[in-house]
Amino acid sequence: KSTGRYARNGGEEETIPAIEWLLELAAKPETARTRPVFRIDNEEVKDNLGLDNSEKHFSVNDITTGNNFERLARESGRIHSKETSLRTPYEKSLKSVADSLLIYQRLAKSFRPQRSVDFAGELKQFEEIFPIGMAAARAHETGAEHDEEDHDQFSGLIDTLIEPGAHEGDRGGVMFWPRVIPPGNDSDADWRSLNSSLFHSITNAAAADRDWKIEIDPAAKAYAGMLTAYKNDKPEEFNSALAGYRDYLDKNGQNAALGKTGKEF
């Protein structure tokens, strides 16, 4: 089971709000992996994974140390093929750990591009170089003369911001991408995920024959700004990005959502 607890202040166990833990998972994944948020009671499972029997809460790093991840995947597959009523307490507990770890991993991949280091900065840079980058990409495809550095920089940002298969996973419900991008003021469309918003911004802008310019949704930029600010422990920048996001919601007729977006850093 996953809990909201982790060791803090010299090892003393405390409970933090779920939203704080979720923000950490989204913006500081390396730190989140060290938090003992998984509860394991079965001593045989703990022995099998080389965990301290005197503890009950473990981090992702604890659970996946060495070749534990491969062993969990292999054992979970074996247990999955076994009728539920025939599973031993050990098998039920280990399967629960494996399933919880899978959910954790899907959550960790659902808030931002995994290769991103400075999400807000990368979006800004991408907007700035898009015209030159698209020209270089088209020239590269046809073998025309172009600056290869422009092409490499543009391609690198594409690879950073759009992960292969992420859009299909988002549409199919495999990923947990939160729907944080509202439709326009005059639209009855559904809210979209950040991944879907970026994908459509890029494909729409790239469809032009020339004079390429990309318009990234202001809500997407505000969302990226919040994650980057939280990662860097910049409360003023976080609150500024949050204010921008709330302003966008207000201007686009999303007053009902404003009450869900008031959590300042």
What are these regions (language model features)?
Residues 1-264:
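Soluble extramembrane regions of membrane proteins in the secretory/endomembrane system
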